[in-house]
Swiss-Prot record:
Positions of Mg(2+) binding: T64
Gene3D superfamilies, alphabetized: 1.10.8.60, P-loop containing nucleotide triphosphate hydrolases, Winged helix-like DNA-binding domain superfamily/Winged helix DNA-binding domain
GO cellular component, one term: Holliday junction resolvase complex
Keywords recorded for this protein, A-Z: ATP-binding, Cytoplasm, DNA damage, DNA recombination, DNA repair, DNA-binding, Hydrolase, Nucleotide-binding
Lineage summary: Bacteria, Pseudomonadati, Pseudomonadota, Alphaproteobacteria, Rickettsiales
Region listing for Head domain (RuvB-H), in residue ranges: 253-342
Identification of the protein by name: Holliday junction branch migration complex subunit RuvB
Assembly description: Homohexamer. Forms an RuvA(8)-RuvB(12)-Holliday junction (HJ) complex. HJ DNA is sandwiched between 2 RuvA tetramers; dsDNA enters through RuvA and exits via RuvB. An RuvB hexamer assembles on each DNA strand where it exits the tetramer. Each RuvB hexamer is contacted by two RuvA subunits (via domain III) on 2 adjacent RuvB subunits; this complex drives branch migration. In the full resolvosome a probable DNA-RuvA(4)-RuvB(12)-RuvC(2) complex forms which resolves the HJ.
Source species, domain of life: Bacteria
Entries under SMART domains matching the protein: AAA
EC numbers, comma separated: 3.6.4.-
Main localisation: cytoplasm
Amino acid sequence: MTNILSPEKSENDQELPIRPSYLQEFVGQQQIKENLSVFIKAAKSRNEHLDHTLFYGPPGLGKTTLAKIISNEIGGNFKSTSGPAILKVADLAAILTNLEKNDVLFIDEIHRLNTAIEEVLYPAMEDFELDIIIGEGSAARSVKITLPKFTLIGATTRLGLLSNPLRDRFGIPMRLNFYNTEELKKVLNRASKLLDIDLTDSGSEEIAKRSRGTPRIALRLLRRIRDFAAVDGKSRVDKEISDFGLNRLEVDCIGLDSNDYRYLKFIADNYNGGPVGIETIAAALSEQRDALEETIEPYLIQIGLLQRTPRGRVITIAAFEHLKMPVPNQSHHQFNIFNENE
């Protein structure tokens, strides 16, 4: 599922010129910033490596950026890979044996590591040792390699898929939350200065409130609105051109697009608002379950249009009102579902 409001990173997201390099430049996630600052300063004062860190939460909120910031703050090299890219134990061994003291190893989608890889990772994280088997059959022997003190930073959008043994080895687990409108305005204002865009306060607010609480989406929309302004002969991005461009992009007043409407209307039209199972929804919409759970559902839940229950997905009265559809008579049972299972 790829669209203008997808929180997943795309090849067209040019983030390097505007990506913050240090904690003081990073906007939002205030508690995480403050805690990281303490942990980093404490580790440096003791001349120790920073504890292994796990960032989790919806995509597009800054997990990769924070990992790079940590690398800059502690003065180590930044090495990046992803769970799906590490196919064999040898792949992981090659990465680990090339690390230096205080390096940061960032593993995106860490929940997708297979069990064999995880088992090699455990002693590397705990004891900074790598146990590998050299040779085959009767000639095989175990070799222990000492690794430098490094910091592993994992990132995941699916914390529940991370195995307990791996999760427990992260000394600093941190959840990233959706941004509010004011925080997104700060992100947009900072980016507009770096990109030399004349962005008014009203234009910034219009883009921010339709960005699904996600900086990556806000920055993507800013670039597209800049295009509309340029073609329309406008020198600045104000509320008028922002509203025009966002409507052309089919982004509504609260940040929903056609995919969200398809999702909500399917449940409303076919199941009177639910409950309905996620597999049924995925099959009907011809979408992958993971795409729905990672791209569409988190924001709908965040703004109160969708609820997950033990019996399936249920859209709320607020969702019917936003769709301008009559609320079914039995809608009151949507909330009884929760009361019965609390």
